[in-house]
Amino acid sequence: MQTDAVWNLLAEQIEHGWDESLPKPAPNPDDLYRPTLIGAWSKNRLVGGAFVMPDSQDAKAFTSIGADKAAQAFERSCCMIQGVAVAAEHRREGIGLKIKRCCDLWAAQHDACIVLSIPTNAAAARMNEKAGYDVLPPQVALCVEVTDDDRGIVCCFPMGGDVPDSRWAFHIVAQPQWAPLAIGQCHMTGSGGRYDDHAIGWMYRADIMP
């Protein structure tokens, strides 16, 4: 099946950052906003692929502090690219960049407004920049504020140190539809991942569509 081919390519080609705990998405013939595999084909051969999904994993940070409405708005607004891969014999052909843009389009068509990605090396970071992403420095936390009942709720997501070059990248693909959002960055300190609200450098802020 095509889904198996895309899944196997991602598992084989992604050296760092592939989350093996994630289940393989089922086929999505109705194109719903749920975990989805995207394949790039040339002459009936798979040349690249991507795995996109609502960012349900990071939404749990809002749920953990009792902000259920903010968690729902975050998950509905933020699309996570879990991985992009290109077949070895088709690298340096611009396929990865085209796949990234396809992921952005998929997110926007499903009413998400932010696409998140985690480049794990300098080459991947450059590709994200070419695709229009804001790329944070390595090991810097991504901070997201979701407005819930006129109260801004902030969660910061540190970057694990297992892969030193890992960094957050984000791209604004539409105006928020579910809740006002802001995105920023900060350095988190201590074993508990503490941060100072005043130390967050906000980079993007937008209200919902009228």
Question: Can you describe what each PLM-predicted range is?
Answer:
Residues D134-P138:
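Short secondary-structure junctions
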Residues L116-E129, Q139-V146:
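Conserved beta-strand-loop-alpha-helix junction that forms the acyl-donor binding cleft
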Residues C78-M80, C102, W106, I114-L116, ...:
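Extended low-polarity, hydrophobic cluster-rich segments
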